[in-house]
Amino acid sequence: MHPVQNADGGSVLQTARNYPIDAATVIDAGAVVKLSGGKVVLAAAAETGAILGIAAEFHSGTEDALNLRANGKWIRVCDNPTLIFECAAPTIKAASGSATTIVPETGDVDAAAADDAFNNAVLVLKEKAANSGNTDALGTQIVVTDYAKTGTVMTKASGGAPGAGDVYEVYPVIGAAIGGVASLGDKRLGITLKTVGATKLRCIGHDYERGAIKLMAIGHALT
């Protein structure tokens, strides 16, 4: 995750603050973090509690001659409740489809994602497989009109038929909570669709040119 701005103004990094952390805790800069027992830890992949913010520095948990804070007792966190942050849009690969459907590869979308979970999400064709006959141009934006849990079928307006291996970026509906559609990745640095999660994040913007989505916390530790 990359802190972008505070919605209520002020520099993101200038408003970052020190919080206690166990010396051995491993957190990467950009990770979504929370408080546990008064100390900073990684947010859970399917976090249901309040989020503190985004780690502003690396804390490797081991001694580092070039970074005396690497295993220190403090870590800086961008903690403004109005913090806007961004990450790369998650991607899926098509396994099959038609002029009006896209079926992601097995495992690219969690099988537990509910019916309609991706309705009104926007897909952007990022890459075509070598043998793809897809007639859509790279960069084509496709609105998902319906999502069926059975078969993980995404319905769309008539257009190019996806080839197996075609790659699409997925942009969740603006204003929608990510929970139930995606969860935080292993290091809490981005969003994955492979696992359904109750992440306390809300999508508030799309940046199609840079392939990024903008997010805010739904529940915050300081409010």
Segments predicted by a language model, with ranges:
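Surface-exposed, low-hydrophobicity beta-strand/loop segments enriched in small/polar/acidic residues
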Residues: M1-T223
